């Protein structure tokens, strides 16, 4: 069996579909190399003294872990000099990072959550890196925040790396979803699954049940029906899964189906949700849709949401298509009665 590396896959996709420009191919390869470096740091853990808090906070008001800071720096350092990017934006930084004048500038914008699920770092549970690529609207001009504020439909590539028992890179460039496993001996990502498909139906849901009392009625209705099992209106038993790492939960859904929900709750009613639209929801929504699933905020398709600011938050409901459509319908019915 011929082993297909990430580089070979990207070159062959470029030849077949002519949708991957050489600059985009090289950008994806650089991001993949950065993910290998992050995977190496994660795997060393306490041996390298990288566990625990960094003693700082990010723009989200969250305490940064040492590996949050390390992963962010790895991605910045790896991508700033290649000539493929005009700027980068990170969940960990208040403003975007424009490529310094000492380096050539390209036509793409890169956004990333350098280490998703960082509350799991010290307990050795799967975490990951999420990334999204956009075209720079006006290449060659000074970058502004407005250049990043494009709906998710404008993404030219999206993906994540999950650092678990294996390190797996999951990628879409608009032609389906493909998984690459890191061969540590060879030092390369190898294609291990092509054209990933999410089943339309499922018996698994992922949500933080401890917040149930804070949810809106449509979400409670859906979960109540799941919990009622084969004696309830759904006529089947459901299992719950919750890792508290979006990368890990979405990876499970891409692998075997399910629905992931991080909904609005009434503790912070002025915020539309918890997850970040640009760094988490949009890239994951693109991946899920490319795999035949669906992703909404309860009211509209996530990829259609027009961003208004870099660190905008959003409710997220994604996964198996029929389940996502059911939850969305419950929201629409509740709005119609209001």
From Swiss-Prot:
Catalytic reactions of this protein: beta-D-fructose 1,6-bisphosphate + H2O = beta-D-fructose 6-phosphate + phosphate
GO BP of this protein: fructose 1,6-bisphosphate metabolic process; fructose 6-phosphate metabolic process; fructose metabolic process; gluconeogenesis; sucrose biosynthetic process
Q: Name one Pfam family in it.
A: FBPase
Binding residues annotated for Mg(2+) 1, in chain numbering: 91, 113, 115
- Cofactor(s) this protein requires: Mg(2+)
Q: Which keywords has UniProt assigned to this entry?
A: Carbohydrate metabolism, Cytoplasm, Hydrolase, Magnesium, Metal-binding
Reported EC number(s) for this entry are 3.1.3.11
Task: Please give an example of a GO cellular component term from this record.
Answer: cytosol
- List the molecular function annotations (GO) for this entry: fructose 1,6-bisphosphate 1-phosphatase activity; magnesium ion binding
Q: What compartments host this protein? A: Cytoplasm
Cofactor notes: Binds 2 magnesium ions per subunit.
Q: Tell me the residue numbers annotated for binding Mg(2+) 2.
A: 113, 116, 280
The metabolic or biological pathway listed in the UniProt record of this protein is: Carbohydrate biosynthesis; gluconeogenesis
Q: Where does substrate bind?
A: 116-119, 208, 274
Q: What interactions and quaternary structure are annotated?
A: Homotetramer.
Q: Which HAMAP family does this one have?
A: FBPase_class1
Q: Which family does it belong to?
A: Belongs to the FBPase class 1 family.
What is this protein's name?
Fructose-1,6-bisphosphatase class 1 1
| Protein's organism | Cupriavidus taiwanensis (strain DSM 17343 / BCRC 17206 / CCUG 44338 / CIP 107171 / LMG 19424 / R1) (Ralstonia taiwanensis (strain LMG 19424))
């Amino acid at each position: 069996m011929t082993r297909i590396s990430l580089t070979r896959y990207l070159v062959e996709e470029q030849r077949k579909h002519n949708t991957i420009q050489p600059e985009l191919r090289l950008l994806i390869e650089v991001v993949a190399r950065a993910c290998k470096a992050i995977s190496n740091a994660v795997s060393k853990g306490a041996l390298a003294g990288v566990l625990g808090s960094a003693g700082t906070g990010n723009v989200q008001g969250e305490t940064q872990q040492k590996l949050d800071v390390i992963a962010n720096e790895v991605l910045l350092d790896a991508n700033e000099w290649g000539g493929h990017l005009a700027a980068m934006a990170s969940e960990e930084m208040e403003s975007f990072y424009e490529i310094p004048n000492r380096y050539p500038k390209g036509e793409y914008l890169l956004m990333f959550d350098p280490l998703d699920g960082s509350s799991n770092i010290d307990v050795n549970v799967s975490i990951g890196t999420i990334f999204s690529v956009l075209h720079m609207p006006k290449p060659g001009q000074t970058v502004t925040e407005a250049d990043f504020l494009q709906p998710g439909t404008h993404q030219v590539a999206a993906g994540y790396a999950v650092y678990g028992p294996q390190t797996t890179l999951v990628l879409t460039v608009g032609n389906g979803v493909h998984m690459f496993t890191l061969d540590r001996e060879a030092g390369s990502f190898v294609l291990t699954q092509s054209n990933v498909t999410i089943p339309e139906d499922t018996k698994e849901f992922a949500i933080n049940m401890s917040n149930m009392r804070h949810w809106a009625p449509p979400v409670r209705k859906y979960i109540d029906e799941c919990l009622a099992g084969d004696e309830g209106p759904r006529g089947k038993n459901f299992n719950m899964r919750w890792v508290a790492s979006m990368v890990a939960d979405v990876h499970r859904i891409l692998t075997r189906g399910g629905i992931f929900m991080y909904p609005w709750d009434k503790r912070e009613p002025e915020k539309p949700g918890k997850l970040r639209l640009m760094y988490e929801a949009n890239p994951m929504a693109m991946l899920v849709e490319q795999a035949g699933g669906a992703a909404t905020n309860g009211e509209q398709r996530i990829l259609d949401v027009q961003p208004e600011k870099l660190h905008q938050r959003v409710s997220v409901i994604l996964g198996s298509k029929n389940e996502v459509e059911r939850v969305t319908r419950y929201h629409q019915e509740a709005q119609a009665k209001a």
